[in-house]
């Protein structure tokens, strides 16, 4: 029997909410965020909101503490730990960002269960501000999946295809767990 690889979405699959909205709402920046997302890509809006939060004295530690209060899907932590202990290879493909995902996974003792996290990059700059960038180039990104709704910053289908090819080469079966439609017809 082939080994198993489980690919998780993060928001609304591991986390019982959207991590971006959790932080934006938690610090009272919902109105600004909604205004920005009506005129620009989601990641660009998040980066601007992070700049506004930083300029108002909200620190990276404040953001981390907010994220640590975000609720997980019931029983997901034990499910992840059991799957990992049984030898399943676990990965994440998410339109969230590195800082948010890693902060939450580490807080719940789940970070080491995952062999790969595919998401939007984020860095803490020299001023201590969280910067969020798109996973794929907004100008040259083209979606290969069967989803017309892939955001311009991340084609999950492209990432899943790479993971799938790697899994097939290593004789692994893939299980995808997410809150939306299946990313590719072949998954």
Which residues are covered by each model-predicted region?
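Alpha-helical substrate-recognition element adjacent to the catalytic core
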Residues: 2-121, 125-126
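C-terminal cap/substrate-recognition subdomain and adjoining C-terminal extension
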Residues: 74-81, 85-89, 96-187
């Amino acid at each position: 029997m082939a080994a198993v690889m489980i690919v998780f979405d993060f928001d609304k699959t591991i986390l019982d909410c959207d991590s971006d909205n959790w932080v934006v709402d938690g610090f009272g920046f919902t109105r600004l965020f909604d205004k920005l997302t009506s005129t620009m890509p989601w990641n660009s809006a998040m980066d601007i909101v992070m700049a506004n939060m930083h300029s108002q004295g909200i620190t990276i530690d404040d953001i981390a503490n907010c994220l640590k209060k975000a609720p997980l899907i019931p029983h997901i932590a034990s499910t992840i730990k059991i799957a990992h202990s049984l030898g399943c290879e676990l990965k994440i493909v998410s339109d969230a960002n590195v800082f948010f995902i890693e902060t939450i996974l580490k807080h719940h003792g789940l970070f080491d269960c995952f062999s790969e996290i595919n998401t939007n990059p984020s860095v803490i700059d020299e001023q201590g501000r969280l910067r969020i960038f798109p996973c794929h180039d907004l100008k040259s990104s083209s979606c290969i999946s069967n989803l017309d709704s892939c955001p311009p910053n991340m084609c999950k289908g492209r990432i899943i295809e790479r993971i799938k090819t790697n899994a097939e080469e290593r004789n692994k079966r893939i299980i995808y767990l997410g809150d939306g439609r299946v990313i590719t017809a072949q998954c």
